[in-house]
Amino acid sequence: MSYQGKKNIPRITSDRLLIKGGRIVNDDQSFYADIYMEDGLIKQIGDNLIVPGGVKTIEANGKMVIPGGIDVHTHLQMPYRGMTTVDDFFQGTKAALAGGTTMIVDHVIPEPEASLTEALEKWREWADGKTCCDYSLHVDITHWSDSVKQEVETLVKQKGVNSFMVYMAYKDMYQMSNTELYEIFTFLGGLGAIAQVHAENGDIIAQEQNRMLELGITGPEGHVLSRPEELEAEAVFRAITIASQTNCPLYVTKVMSKSSVDLISQARKKGYVVFGEPITASLGTDGTHYWSKNWAKAAAFVTSPPLSPDPTTPDYINSLLASGDLQVTGSAHATFSTAQKAIGKDNFTLIPEGTNGIEERMSVIWDKSVATGKMDENQFVAVTSTNAAKIFNLYPRKGRIAVGSDSDLVIWDPDAVKIVSAKSHHSAAEYNIFEGMELRGAPLVVICQGKIMMEDGTLHATQGTGRFIPCSPFPDYVYKRIKARTKMAELHAVPRGMYDGPVHDLASTPKAGTPAGSTKGSPTKQTAPVRNLHHSGFSLIGNQADESGVRSASRRIVAPPGGRSNITSLS
């Protein structure tokens, strides 16, 4: 990059920038034009722009100019068992900027029974003093009651929060019952908020964890063995079903397996309003590392749902991201030191969960999807920025290069090649799960709020300059279809006359649990009930248990790395 302009320009003009000779890439079009920015906003786009004096000019030399990335899933400065992730809001957002991300959406995780509002204010206090890029917040619902219900309504209407995550896992901590999911989805749909879900079957996981420990499996491999992808897929299916019944939009976080991707894809094809979020880890690597002889390396990959041991999974997920079956990407960046991970050295259930990915996200997607020809540059912008802005009602302020939009821009070099290393990354973590990976595509210049935050690999981030960006309810991108369906889905009783015929006397009915006409020792064979899956909104892929005939009793096969090549059913 070359830079032109006067040195020591007055402060009043220091926020004036002109990018010349770049190729602007939005999610729907690409074209050559210059961009003039002032006071943190894009003021002009076109050729031969008339701009004030004292403007700093950046020559893009034909390189791509894209909207800054939006990472929709981070866990910075996250407390856990008296510890805190090693990347706080400053270190984490600095790493984000280094990778071309100019906005994050972090998760507020209240302690069970704690106030959601107080937790939000605590996260705001942490972030406001440290972030060096803009941020918004999701709030996780860790328990459900009338008081929580009131708080959720306040957060939506007064505090700028429009998305809430619920857990189907972490039994006896955060896990919600089906009834609670139904109530929460119904309530969020009425408020115009987005229901996010961590989808895993927590009840079965708890049983499987105990079984692994009883077998003497205490290392990181026990994590993935106790959380097979069928448990993720079952929960995804259940969440989609409940969300459909309540006419609430559903956002599935951390999509990690082929089975889950297939279910989301299938549901969307049938018209369900559901969005899927793969993360940097599931797009860039796999779960074969859980069997590493190096405990610290294996533990670095521990996250939930776990990475798939099938090494073909990342390519599969990238393909469905490119095809539009998945819409948005996050990093789920939650970094713990090796010493912190080691509290679970003798019991994998105690290993703090989380991987890095905030800095690598955009390069991983470019390398795995664009450089391989799966998606084009416009789709890249959509899945790294624009779709996130649309889903969370930030568009077109964020996620687009247009007059009036925030001047969060990245000059992207598709030909740049970098080798990922913990020695050179900007995270405070001493490991990197993408260590040694050669990635094509990287940012040359990163501009946030109209200020140059990175140029030629050098960061100029300033702590505390990030702003909280409120998210309003009822985003059109999500709720237009929901509103139309609400109008069409009004239920009415069938008008009919009063029934005046005989009514059976319940007093003469046999006691519940005693089938009429049966006697002890009766030779009559009872027909086993068969569930008709065709009655559901959509079916699971592959043969179902009802369809497979006689099966071997209680035989379980544990797949080694590379085992389950393409699990697409829950049978």
Swiss-Prot record:
GO terms for molecular function: hydrolase activity, acting on carbon-nitrogen (but not peptide) bonds, in cyclic amides. Keywords: Cell projection, Cytoplasm. It comes from the Eukaryota. Residues 516-529 have a biased composition (Polar residues). Pfam families: Amidohydro_1. GO terms for cellular component: cytosol; growth cone. InterPro entries: Amidohydro-rel, Hydantoinase/dihydroPyrase, Metal-dep_hydrolase_composite, Metal_Hydrolase, Metallo-dep_Hydrolases_sf. Disulfide bonds: none annotated. One of its GO terms (biological process) is actin crosslink formation. Residues 502-530, 542-571 are annotated as: Disordered. It is found in: Cytoplasm; Cell projection, Growth cone. Induction: By the neuronal determination factor neurog2/X-ngngr-1. Repressed by Notch signaling. Expressed in the prospective neuroectoderm at the end of gastrulation. During open neural plate stages, expressed broadly throughout the anterior neural plate and in the three bilateral stripes of the posterior neural plate where primary neurons arise. At tadpole stages, expression is maintained throughout the central nervous system and in the eye retina. Homotetramer and heterotetramer. Necessary for signaling by class 3 semaphorins and subsequent remodeling of the cytoskeleton. Plays a role in axon guidance, neuronal growth cone collapse and cell migration. Belongs to the metallo-dependent hydrolases superfamily. Hydantoinase/dihydropyrimidinase family. This is Dihydropyrimidinase-related protein 3-B. It comes from Xenopus laevis. The lineage of its organism: Eukaryota, Metazoa, Chordata, Craniata, Vertebrata.
